[in-house]
Amino acid sequence: MISAGDFRKGVTFVMDGHPYVVIDFQHVKPGKGAAFVRTKYKNLKTGSTREEAFNPSDKFPRAHIETKEMQYLYNDSDLYYFMDNETYEQVPLTLVEVEDAIKYLKENDSAIIKFYEGRPFQVEPPIFVELKVIETEPGVKGDTATNVTKAATVETGAIVYVPVFVNEGNIIKVDTRTGEYMSRV
């Protein structure tokens, strides 16, 4: 059990049968009245966030999250298949479970899959990925103003804003946390 007074960023807990992770917290002790913990937390299954004030003595069971590195194999209409690198077991995931991560994953790429009670609920791609630009407008010669960007579609279908000197066929490094262009490879 964990008390609300012990909440920190990244702490997982179970409330009403759903697993949550603390995104932000603030211990508040007003001049008048009892202290409380203002908490912003995210549902690990649905991804929805909420803010709520808890009494510091409120207790919750910890949510035990298991993580595994798995390899993305392929997608078959609505399902995305990942393989456990140790047991070679294949796990099918829905589009809701792979969310934004699939925009940055190519076949055979590794990803971190998070499980709660044996069920996968979230996919985390590597922090940096290298992707090939398949479609973008050609750069205009002489357009050297700083921070000029253009939209580029990469091989996974994601749209990344890149500097004007990046052309089709270039391989770029992308930060998957923000979706931003990092460099040309």
From Swiss-Prot:
Record keywords, A-Z: Cytoplasm, Elongation factor, Protein biosynthesis
Superkingdom field: Bacteria
Pfam families listed in its UniProt record: EFP, EFP_N, Elong-fact-P_C
Subcellular location: Cytoplasm
Parts forming coiled coils: none
HAMAP family the record matches: EF_P
Function field: Involved in peptide bond synthesis. Stimulates efficient translation and peptide-bond synthesis on native or reconstituted 70S ribosomes in vitro. Probably functions indirectly by altering the affinity of the ribosome for aminoacyl-tRNA, thus increasing their reactivity as acceptors for peptidyl transferase.
Protein's recorded name: Elongation factor P
